[in-house]
Amino acid sequence: MADPRGPVDHGVQIRFITEPEGATEMGTLRRSGRRPARDARASTYGVAVRVQGIAGQPFVVLNSGEKGTDSFGVQIKGGNNRGSPGALSSDSELPENPYSQVKGRPATSRSSTSDEEPKDHLNGKLIRSQSQASLTGLAFMSPSNRSTSLLELAPKPTSSINTIDTAPLSSVDSLINKFDSQKGGQVRGRTGRRTRTLPHEQRKRSQSLDSRLPRDTREEREHQSANHWTRGTKYDNHVDSSKNPSQKQSPFSSFSRSRQTQDWVLQSFEETRDPAMVQFKSTPDLLRDQRETAPPGSADHVKATIYGILREGSSESEASVRRKVSLVLEQMQPLGMVSPASTKALAGQAELTRKMEELQKKLDEEVKKRQKLEPSRVGLERQLEEKAEECHRLQELLERRKGEVQQSSKELQNMKLLLGQEEGLRHGLEAQVKELQLKLKHSQSPDSGKESLLKDLLDTRELLEELLEGKQRVEEQLRLRERELTALKGALKEEVASHDQEVEHVRLQYQRDTEQLRRSMQDATQDHAALEAERQKMSSLVRELQRELEETSEETGHWQSMFQKNKEELRATKQELLQLRMEKEEMEEELGEKMEVLQRDLEQARASTRDTHQVEELKKELRRTQGELKELQAEQQNQEVTGRHRNQVLEKQLAALREEADRGRELEQQNLQLQKTLQQLRQDCEEASKAKVASETEAMMLGQRRATVETTLRETQEENDEFRRRILGLEQQLKEARGLAEGGEAVEARLRDKVHRLEVEKQQLEEALNAAQEEEGNLAAAKRALEVRLDEAQRGLARLGQEQQALNRALEEEGKQREALRRSKAELEEQKRLLNRTVDRLNKELEQIGDDSKLALQQLQAQMEDYKEKARKEVADAQRQAKDWASEAEKNSGGLSRLQDELQRLRQALQTSQAERDTARLDKELLAQRLQGLEQEAENKKRFQDDKARQLKSLEEKVSRLEAELDEEKNTVELLTDRVNRGRDQVDQLRTELMQERSARQDLECDKISLERQNKDLKTRLASSEGFQKPSASLSQLESQNQLLQERLQAEEREKTVLQSTNRKLERRVKELSIQIDDERQHVNDQKDQLTLRVKALKRQVDEAEEEIERLDSLRKKAQRELEEQHEVNEQLQARIKSLEKDAWRKASRSAAESALKQEGLSSDEEFDNVYDPSSIASLLTESNLQTSSC
């Protein structure tokens, strides 16, 4: 039956060609009818690709290339088939010549349209399998026909999908890199290894179908071109590859790669395969059976995934992509074989995963079951608790019912006894009545007997009446006594109840007192913790002081560095002064030369004038100037002496400063020692704090243990009371049983059994009492051990107090050291004052020297002006008198103009020096004002520091007082604990006495009960012995018994009064103890409040002291800065003084030279010449200039 014809699909025909040497040229790809140049290499290898459609599915023909014989086909399935799976067209059959003209219909793109693609196309893992196209296995043909189709290499059905994903696919990367190496064109041949690197824009995958349209249209244009597919083509781009030789590799590499792939293909042909796995496809018509989709583990699925991966990220043609797919599959076939070990491992892994899943499911189920059962469990627990409470209640009811049954049994026994006594009385009375009846019967017979009997009856009646009256009296007495006894019982019960209430009140009060004492102890521990916090604050203060000391050491280092810098600056200024001196000497030499020229002019004028009167006047003026010069020299010498003295003073001050620097170093060493001691103190404090924490924890544990011991003691005491009560009740039961033993033998046997049981219980109770006593002893021992531990803890606290005292001593030593530092600071300030005073003196002296120099300069300027006027007059006269000297006069006038310029320069220098002097004066005044302010601030600081030192001393004294008060309070607390212990002992004694009293009362009650029984027995005996015994004997016995009973009652009343008096005394003692404890507690609370207030005040004072110390530190820093500025001013003044001393030395040398000249016998003309010597004039000018500059 013919299938309907579907649309024709296109495949790719790939041919692998090997060209031996000398072989004819194979058909190559022709582009525009032109053959490419033949490659000169031997054994070339290539691939011929052709697209061909077979019944709506693409088909690939691969040919090995040996003279066009070796070829094989690969079917490419399209997942999107439009026709039926069995449709086959007659036009789509494979022709005999695989290289014939391809039909005009181009190959449409069957690439995948899925949006999921890998981001990097060079990735080697082939994980996706979402392509629509697929490659079938190779169909093996008969070996006789070399142009056969390949056999389909289907994998084993047992191999899972994971075999492809987990196997390493490095060969895929290499193959993809081979075929991605084109830059210019797409090479279809296998001429060499290609390394194509696509740009980033081409590697990106388009995320929609619209972005793929231009690529598909480009491919269609390539397929529709006439020159693209021609008859007998082998390579698609062989011409381009021949034009680009740079893309080719060596022939050896290309040959080796081609041979390797060909050998691998032949190996794949020769491998023995299972006939069930091999499908022989001799003709393309048989390929239509492969239209159904391949399973996810088959080779078709792998081919489809590879095709999708290679097709979706590249711009290559579909034929090249399919060729790459076939090559990748060739390289992947050996990797697809799964080893048995890996299959076993995978199977084991699958089993393990299955087991893990089962276990996880079981765990989830168990968790769910537990979650479901949790509310039921909670309900069951609640029900159990309720049932336990109900059981407890039922046990209590049983015990109550047992007590009621015992009481009812006791009452029944008493009733039985009373009934037995009444029956005995009834029997006795019946016997008497019978006897009387018999007597009456006997007496009825004779009359004499009647009379005697009547008399006897009368007598007996009288006796009976008397006995009845006596009996009534006795009964009344007994009733009265019984009433008295009941009243006494009620009073005793009330007294016992009141006594119990008082004891309970005392116990509660004792508990309250103990709780208050515990609270007071806790408060004391809190106070101790607060004191420790204060101690830590003090340590923080010490640390701050240490930091301040470090800052002072840093400041001293800064001062030293500033001192060195100032020294360097002084050296630089000295060098500058030397340079200025050299410049001044040069100027002096120039002035000397000028004065020599003026002297010559004056000599010429003098020779021309020869006026004796003028010469005399000039001589007088010269003498006056010489005297003034001598005076100036003397003043200069005095100034030199004063300067030397000042230098000595300054040297002394420098020595003092060096000593201060040494002291600063010593202080630094002391600071280091203090730091070491502080570190040790910190370590000690940490150890003490650790020990304190341990002691506090021990104290807490001891308190807890003490509380537990007290509770256990109370419980044991209550149990002892209960045991004693049970014992008394049992003794009473024994006594009652002994009373009942006088009944019958059966009752005695029962009572013996009961007594035996009760004795056994008594023994058990005695053993329990002994065990309780032993427990009490153990608890007492534990209590003693706890008291010992408490004593040790108190000793530890005392040790901590001692350590705190040691720390306080260390703080006092630090305070002393601080005071020493303050003293040294005060000494430094005093030295600063001395320096300021010396500076003021120097400033005053400099001002005086400046004033003197100003006066001298003014005089010299006036003299110079006079000399100038005289010289001008003489020059005018000389010009008038001698015209011959006109040229010389012109020269002199030029020299005078020069001198005038120099004088103007000197005047400007004087003006500048005066301005500098004024500024210096203003600076001095400002410095003096600052110094005064600093002195005042320093005095205020000293006063403030003294006040602070006093306050610190007072604070330290207060701290010592508080520590002493704390010690006293600790002692008081210890005394209170001792008193409390004594009170406890007294309370224990009172309890024992009360228990003794209770036992005595119970004994008295038992005696009373026994007496009542005896009275009843006596009554019965009296009733029974009325007719047999004489009344006198019975009455005497009854009276004696009554007397005994009265004596016993009196003795009991006496004992009762004694016990009441003792109880009252004990109550008074307890009240007194409670009052004392309350008073002591109030006193302790008051002291604690006072201590808290004092501590708060001390904290405030310490905070204020810290703030004041910080302010003093800031003021100290300011004072140090001002001292540094003052040092700089002093150094400037010292430099000026040195310059003045050098100037004075120069003046002295010049005066000595002038005196030597005076000693020589010179004429008046020579003296005149010496007066107008240029060196003298230059010296005068330089002296004035130097004085002004120094000012």
Curated annotation (Swiss-Prot):
Cell compartment(s), UniProt: Cell junction, Tight junction
Cysteine disulfide links: none
Region (Tail): 1149-1191
Role according to the record: Probably plays a role in the formation and regulation of the tight junction (TJ) paracellular permeability barrier.
Family per record: Belongs to the cingulin family.
PTM-bearing positions, type Phosphoserine: 84, 89-90, 92, 129, 131, 134, 149, 159, 208, 211, 250, 268, 326, 339, 448, 1163-1164
Region (Disordered): 1-43, 63-130, 178-259, 872-898, 1148-1169
GO terms under cellular component: apical junction complex; bicellular tight junction; brush border; myosin complex
Gene that encodes the chain: Cgn
A GO BP entry: bicellular tight junction assembly
GO MF terms, alphabetically ordered: actin binding; microtubule binding
Record field: compositional bias (Basic residues): 190-206
Keywords carried by this UniProt record: Acetylation, Cell junction, Coiled coil, Phosphoprotein, Tight junction
Biased composition regions of type Low complexity, renumbered to the chain: 242-259
Domain notes from UniProt: Deletion of the TJP1/ZO1 interaction motif (ZIM) decreases but does not abolish colocalization with TJP1/ZO1.
Name of the featured protein: Cingulin
PANTHER family: CINGULIN, CINGULIN-LIKE PROTEIN 1-RELATED
Domain of life: Eukaryota
Family annotation (InterPro entries): Myosin_tail
UniProt keyword annotation of Coiled coil present: yes
Origin species: Mus musculus
Reported tissue expression: Lung, kidney and intestine.
Keyword Lipid metabolism assigned: no
Coiled coil residues, start to end: 343-1150
Pfam families per record: Myosin_tail_1
Subunit-level organization: Homodimer. Interacts with TJP1/ZO1 and SPEF1.
Residue numbers carrying N6-acetyllysine: 567
Chain ranges for the short sequence motif ZIM as given in the UniProt record: 42-56
